[in-house]
């Protein structure tokens, strides 16, 4: 099996509401795939199911050929391999930027303080924040907080990075610095599954774009193909609305 990630007929309900209705797709190493769709279409739920923050009701998810949805799956090992960057940063307010990054390295990977610090500083430098290593989250802008979140995920050396609307909580002028880091990661070959409506990033960096609606993948394809020649009316209307909301500049 050559796929890094394979999602096979995944269903998820919350009470009587079925949020994921038989989602299936695959990703190869180095792919940067983006999930788009209206609010409530299941995008974030799909991400959370991949690293077991949310449990699926049925179906299977494979990472590197291994079924990671079985009861005996080592969830901590899964989360070492699948990093996640959250919409609201999820940083510990009482820890510095550096310590937010080293925490997982020490607690999960069991590294000593010096090893963890070396890796953390390398990743903070990678996202342009080494100078802020001793700053606390309250002293950082939203864009800086999100870049710390990315550094924290990268420090675990994951096979796959999940991004759940990483720019939606940011002031508009701070979006660019986060998108730039994501674009750099894409160009370096990081495998990424992203929920985002940042169309500039989608057009320039995405391998494929998946359009979700009502818990299903309506259409999948290269961004250029979907923007220029969508097969489904639902795709066309959604993307037209998205372009209008973002000023039509893509």
Regions found by a protein language model. Give the residues of each.
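C-terminal boundary and immediately downstream tail of ABC-type ATPase nucleotide-binding domains
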Residues: 224-250
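ABC family nucleotide-binding domain
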Residues: 3-5, 11-214, 218-223
């Amino acid at each position: 099996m050559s796929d890094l990630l394979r999602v096979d007929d995944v269903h998820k309900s919350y009470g009587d509401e079925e949020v994921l209705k038989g989602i299936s797709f695959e990703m190869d190493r180095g792919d940067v795939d983006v999930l788009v769709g209206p609010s409530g279409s299941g995008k974030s739920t799909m991400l959370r199911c991949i690293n077991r923050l949310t449990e699926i009701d049925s179906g299977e998810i494979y990472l590197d050929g291994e079924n990671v949805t079985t009861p005996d799956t080592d969830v901590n090992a899964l989360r070492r391999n699948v990093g996640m960057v959250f919409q609201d940063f999820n940083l510990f307010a009482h820890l510095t930027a550096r310590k937010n990054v080293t925490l997982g390295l020490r607690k999960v990977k069991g590294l000593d303080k010096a090893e963890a610090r070396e890796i953390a500083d390398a990743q903070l430098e990678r996202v342009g924040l080494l100078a802020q290593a001793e700053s606390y989250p309250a002293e950082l802008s939203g864009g800086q907080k999100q870049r710390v979140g990315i550094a924290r995920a990268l420090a675990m050396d994951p096979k796959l990075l999940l991004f759940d609307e990483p720019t939606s909580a940011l002031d508009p002028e701070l979006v660019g610095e986060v998108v730039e880091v994501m674009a750099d990661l894409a160009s370096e070959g990081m495998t990424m599954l992203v929920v985002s409506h940042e169309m500039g990033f989608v057009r320039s960096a995405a391998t494929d774009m998946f359009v979700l609606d009502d818990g299903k993948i309506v259409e999948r394809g290269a961004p250029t193909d979907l923007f220029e020649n969508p097969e489904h009316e639902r795709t066309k209307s959604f993307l037209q609305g998205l372009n209008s909301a973002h000023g039509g500049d893509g």
